[in-house]
A protein has these predicted regions:
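Accessory beta-strand-rich segments of carbohydrate-active enzymes
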Residues: 1-86, 112-113, 128, 132, ...
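Aromatic- and glycine-enriched glycan-recognition loops and surfaces
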Residues: 158, 167-170, 223-251
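Substrate-binding/catalytic cleft of secreted carbohydrate-active enzymes
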Residues: 227, 242-357
């Protein structure tokens, strides 16, 4: 399985392989991974990133601006084995009022062969002090041409003093690994924070059931991780503890926030204020059913990109002055269907039902 990871293109674009367009227009703001295996031929292939100019794309992304980055920074092609990990969802959550937590690890495994295939899937979990607290490995049979979800739910004892917060940004280390025929085939290292978020009827975001005091700052990452880290540290020194980007950020931004101890309200790359008050069908892009799929793609991409980061305390459907309508209703329903306890925020809801706080 061969994938193209793309970001920092600098414009909306489409992907062509060997002269054939394989994607619809993709927005410039959301880093994206595209499966390209079905379009590759034996021998040499040509991949083209072609800039497109579609009026509807601009209408959804008004007032969004990217920092200046070298074009195609962090763009690459990577390959995965035909039997292996497609994605994962990980949480380390408290168990009632007890002094321990429970890891919830969902691993999505793909088998693209036409035959059932066997593998061994396991993980190691280390606490922030480097102590091995749990490990397991099991054998599974994955049906031909299918995707299976394998769930682990072990307890993690003596976890309370490792509760993640802005003042105590302690991170566990987990390693997912795949073996076939006794040989290690895949390693996936990840950082996990022990935290549980929610919200109450007062519109407050909760951490371990208690309201968070948030000093928010609108912020998008700089062109590189080093500069961004310096800027975040400076903001923390001024008392800022919550960053509100305008669109999905590079992976390293969320990892920095996990490590530095700063909360993030992530946001889909949706902003259309100029027609926000026009609630006729098609008046605002948010109420144009023809754009529903593009809205859902952007919101889903935002969630999938950030879901495993402990610094994420809420998800925003779009800019505060973006109009409401059919597409925003569907976007809210889509995010709700994922079962995440973190609140969904849409300031443009203006009293309607498609926002949690």
């Amino acid at each position: 399985m061969t994938w193209l990871h793309r970001e920092s293109v600098g414009a909306d674009y489409a992907i062509f392989i060997n002269g054939e367009q394989i994607t619809e227009p993709i927005d410039r703001f959301t880093p994206t991974e595209i499966l390209i295996s079905p379009y590759l031929e034996q021998g040499e292939n040509t991949i083209a990133v072609v800039v497109v100019a579609e009026a509807y794309m601009d209408s959804i992304s008004e007032q969004l601006n990217l920092p200046e980055r070298k074009q195609f920074t962090n763009c690459y092609i990577f390959a995965q084995r035909r039997v292996g990990v497609f994605d994962y969802n990980v949480r380390l959550l408290p168990v009632g009022d007890n002094d321990y937590g429970r890891l919830k690890l969902d691993v999505y495994v793909d088998n693209t062969f036409t035959t059932d295939e066997e593998l061994e899937l396991g993980y190691d979990l280390y606490d922030p002090d480097g102590k091995l607290v749990d490990y397991t490995v099991n054998r599974y049979l994955i049906e031909a041409q299918s995707r299976d979800t394998i769930t682990f739910k072990p307890y993690s004892y003596n976890s309370n003093h490792f509760r993640w917060s802005e003042r105590n940004p302690k991170l566990y280390t987990a390693m997912i690994y795949v073996k076939r025929g006794g040989v290690n085939r895949e390693y996936i290292p990840l950082k996990v924070g022990f935290a549980e978020y929610g919200y109450n009827e007062k519109g407050e975001i909760l951490l371990f059931g208690k309201p968070l005091y948030l000093n928010k700052e609108r912020y998008n990452s700089a062109s590189d991780a080093k500069t961004t880290e310096s800027q975040i540290k400076a903001l923390k020194a001024k008392g800022v503890n919550c960053l509100c980007p305008d669109y999905p950020q590079p992976h390293w931004f969320y990892s920095l926030c996990d490590r530095l101890g700063v909360y993030v309200i992530d946001c889909a790359a949706i902003s259309s204020p100029s027609k926000g008050d026009n609630r006729n069908v098609g008046g605002t892009p948010s109420n144009d059913p023809l754009l529903k799929d593009e809205y859902l793609r952007r919101v889903d991409a935002m969630y999938r990109r950030a879901q495993n980061h402990v610094s994420i305390i809420a998800f925003s459907l779009g800019g505060a002055t973006t109009g409401n309508g059919y597409n925003m209703y569907k976007a809210y329903e889509q995010l709700k269907s994922y079962g995440d306890s973190r609140p969904i925020i849409f300031e443009g809801a203006q009293g309607e039902w498609n926002t949690d706080i």
